[in-house]
Curated annotation (Swiss-Prot):
This is Probable ATP-dependent RNA helicase DDX46. It comes from Homo sapiens. The modification Phosphoserine is found at S199, S295, S296, S346, S804, S928. Residues 1-24, 50-73, 81-103 have a biased composition (Basic residues). Keywords: Acetylation, ATP-binding, Coiled coil, Helicase, Hydrolase, Isopeptide bond, Lipoprotein, mRNA processing, mRNA splicing, Myristate, Nucleotide-binding, Nucleus, Phosphoprotein, RNA-binding, Spliceosome, Ubl conjugation. Pfam families: DEAD, Helicase_C, KH_12. The keyword Electron transport does not apply. Residues 1-228 are annotated as: Disordered.
Amino acid sequence: MGRESRHYRKRSASRGRSGSRSRSRSPSDKRSKRGDDRRSRSRDRDRRRERSRSRDKRRSRSRDRKRLRRSRSRERDRSRERRRSRSRDRRRSRSRSRGRRSRSSSPGNKSKKTENRSRSKEKTDGGESSKEKKKDKDDKEDEKEKDAGNFDQNKLEEEMRKRKERVEKWREEQRKKAMENIGELKKEIEEMKQGKKWSLEDDDDDEDDPAEAEKEGNEMEGEELDPLDAYMEEVKEEVKKFNMRSVKGGGGNEKKSGPTVTKVVTVVTTKKAVVDSDKKKGELMENDQDAMEYSSEEEEVDLQTALTGYQTKQRKLLEPVDHGKIEYEPFRKNFYVEVPELAKMSQEEVNVFRLEMEGITVKGKGCPKPIKSWVQCGISMKILNSLKKHGYEKPTPIQTQAIPAIMSGRDLIGIAKTGSGKTIAFLLPMFRHIMDQRSLEEGEGPIAVIMTPTRELALQITKECKKFSKTLGLRVVCVYGGTGISEQIAELKRGAEIIVCTPGRMIDMLAANSGRVTNLRRVTYVVLDEADRMFDMGFEPQVMRIVDNVRPDRQTVMFSATFPRAMEALARRILSKPIEVQVGGRSVVCSDVEQQVIVIEEEKKFLKLLELLGHYQESGSVIIFVDKQEHADGLLKDLMRASYPCMSLHGGIDQYDRDSIINDFKNGTCKLLVATSVAARGLDVKHLILVVNYSCPNHYEDYVHRAGRTGRAGNKGYAYTFITEDQARYAGDIIKALELSGTAVPPDLEKLWSDFKDQQKAEGKIIKKSSGFSGKGFKFDETEQALANERKKLQKAALGLQDSDDEDAAVDIDEQIESMFNSKKRVKDMAAPGTSSVPAPTAGNAEKLEIAKRLALRINAQKNLGIESQDVMQQATNAILRGGTILAPTVSAKTIAEQLAEKINAKLNYVPLEKQEEERQDGGQNESFKRYEEELEINDFPQTARWKVTSKEALQRISEYSEAAITIRGTYFPPGKEPKEGERKIYLAIESANELAVQKAKAEITRLIKEELIRLQNSYQPTNKGRYKVL
C-alpha cells in the first residue's frame, strides 16, 4: 500500500499534494495507479529519446555548418564527442545515485501517514530539482555547442563586415571621381557651346524631351536594383540634371554632348519603346538561345528600336545641312589674270588655236581663252620648277583650256580621252586655291576633296599630287577601303589640306568617332574624277551626301573620258553655271594605239594569245582583259602552265595584294597581268605595249578605256580584241570605236554585224545599242524605281544596302515578304462528321444503288465511252482473267483535256463552277462547315529565316497562339532551279475552321521572318565568293 502510493505520488506531483486522496484509494485504484505509473515512465523515456534525438540533430547541423563554412579538423570533432559522452555518463550515474540515496534515506520511526506524506513530498521536490538541474546542464551544453558552431559564423560575419567597409570606401571614391567628371563635363559642354555654330549636326538633330526623360526615370525608380546599380543610376541622374540646366541656359537648338548623356538618353528611349507596347493578348514567349550571353538589360531592348538607333548613328553626319544657319569664311576663287599675249588674240585666232589643239569645243558663257605655256596660267615658281623636274614641257589640249577656266573660279565639266593629262588639269588650280587660304588649325578638315571610283585611281592621283605638295608644304591623305581604318584616322587627325578618297570610305571617316576625325566645313574645292563611272558604279547616294554637306558656294570640277548624256544631266545638279570643255570628240581611242579585231572561235583564243605574247612580250608589258574573276583565275593557271609568269588583278583580291601587284607591274617586276575592268580606269603603266581583250567588251566606253591603257604619253601601243560569233551583239560598239578613231574595220567583223542585224530583223526584234553601265545602284526617276526587281529590293533591305533616302524601309520589307509568300487562299465546305454506326440495308439503300448506277452510265455517256464501256482497271482485269495481254488503255481526248484542266486549275487555285454546284448540292443534304486554308511559300527566303519558322518549337508556339494547324510541305529548290511538274517549292500550309486563326498564324510567321531579316541586316558580314578575302 505504501509502495504503491509512493510511486503514485512520485510520478504525479499534483496529486501528491492532497494526502486525503491517497489514503482513500481502493485496490482497484492502486492497480490503475500502477498502470499510470508505467505509462508515465514510458513517456519520460520517450521524452529523453526525443531530447537526445534533437540534440543529435543540432550536433549534425553544427557539423554540417562547420564543414561548409570553415571545415574544422576532425580531431576536434572527436574530442568534443568524447567530452559530451563522458558528461552524459556522469549525468546518468549522478541521477542513479541520487535516486538510490532518496529511496534509502526514509526514517522508520514515523507513522505511515507522515512517512508517506513526507517521502512523497521529498521525492516530488527532489524530482523537480533534479529535472531543473538537468535542464540547466542541458541548456549549458547546448549553449556551448552553439558557441562552438557559431564561432565560424561570427568569423564569416566579421569578414563580410570588412568587405562591406571596403565596398563603401570604394563607392565613396567613385562618387568623388564622378563629381570631378561632372566638372570636366561642364567644361566640355561650354566648349561645345562656343564652337556650336560650326557643327553640321545641330540643324538635323531633334532635342530630347526633358519631361519624357524625367517620367521614364521615375518608372525606373520602382524597380529593385543592386546597390551598385542604384549608385550608378544616381550618378546618371546628377549628370542628366546638370545637362538639363546647361541646355536650358544655352538655347533651344543645342545638342546634348558627352558619352554619359548619350547613354542615358538611349536607355530612356529604349525603356519607352518597351513600356508603350500594348499587347491585348498574352505575350508569346520564345526560347532565348543566347540567354547566357546577354544580360536582362539587353533583353529589354526592342530590335526595331536598336536597328533604328544604329542606322541613325551611322548616318548622323550624312543628313542634309541647312547652310543658311552656318557662317562660312569668305574665300577667293578667281585667280586668273589674262596675260597681254592672250588678250591680243581675236576670237577667230582663238577658234583656230582650239581647232589645232585636237578640236577643243567649249560650251558656256565667259570661258577664258586657252593658254599656250605654263607661265601663262598664273602658278608659282615652285610649281613651275616641279613641272620642269618631272618632264611636263607644255600643256596638253585639255590642260590649255581647263586650267584657265578653273583658275577663273568657274565650275567645269572636262571631257577628254584617257592619257590626256586630266589629273594635272585639276591639280594645278587646286594648289593655287589652297595656298590663297589660311593654314589649317587643329580640328579643322581639308580644303580640297578629290573623289574617285576605284582605289587604284585614288592611289595614282595621290602619288601625282605628292610630286608638288612636298615643295608647297601641303599634306595629302589617301582615304580608301580595304585597308585598316586606324592609320587613315591618325593621318586625318594630324590634319591634311587635300583628301583623295573613294566615296564609301570617306563617309565612314565623316561618321567615325562622332564626326571628330574630320569634317567638311573648310572644303571649298571638290573634284569628281571619272565622274560618270562613279555614278554608274552606284556611288550616287554617297557622292551626293558628301557634296550636299559642302558649302553651296564651293567650286566643283568633274572630269572623265566618257560622259553620257544621262550622266551629264545628273552632274548639272551639283554644278553652278558650268563650262563644258571637250577635247577630241566624245570617247575616242588615242591615235597612237593600233587596233586589231579578230573574229575567232572560243577554242582557238588561247593559242592566238600565246602567239601574240611570243611576238610582243619582249618589247614591254602586256595586260589581258577578261570579263569575270573566275575567268581571270582560270586564264592565270593556263598561262602559268605555259611557262608565262603572270599575276591576276580583280575585285576579289585583298587590297594589300592589289597594291603590291600594281606596283610590281608598274616597276616591271612582272610584265604580264590578267585583269578585269577594275584595272581599266586610270591605270598608267609605262612601257605597256600590248592590250588584249580576251573577253570582248560589252559596251563602247569599256572598250575605249581598255584600249586607252596603252599608247600613253606619245608612245606606240597595240590593242587586240577577240570576238566570237556568240558575241555578235557587241560588234556594233567595236565598229563604232574603230570608225571614230579612224581605223579600218575588218571585213569579217562587218559581216558578223550585218548577219546579226539580219537575224534580229527576221525575228522582229529591235537592236538596242548598249550604253555601258546603266546606273545600277541609283534611281534616275520614279518610273525606274517602281519597276525595280522585287527580290533584289528585298535582298538590299535585308543586307543593309538600301539608300539613306529610303524612309519606308520597314514598310518595304513587309511588302516584299508578302510578295515572296506568293500566298494561295482556299475556302472549302467540309461535311460535318457523322456517327460511325452503319444502318442496316433497307429498301431506300437499294434505290440509292440504282440511282448510283444510272449516274455512272450517264457519266460514261458524257465521256463518249458508251454505256457498256469500262474504265482502265476493269479492262486490264478482264484481259488478265481471259488470259490475254494487257493492251494500251483507250483514253479519249476529252479525258486528257480534263486532266490538263485540273492541273491548270490546281496551279491557279481555281475551282470550276460545276464542282462548286456539286459541293453545294452535297452540302445541302448534310450539315457542313467552312475550312480556311492558306499556303505561304518560304523557299526563297534566307536559310536562317526558313529555319526560324520551320523549327518544331516555333510551329508549336504559333499553333498554340493562333489555334491553327501548320504543316511544312514541298521541297527546297536553290535559286535559279525551277521545280518539275508535280513538285512544289517548300511552303507552309495553314488550316483552320476560323479565318481569324489563319490570319493570326500568318501574321506571326511574317513577324518572325521580318525579325530575322532585320537581324541579318544589322549583323551582315560580306562573304567572298572568290578565292580571295575581301576587306
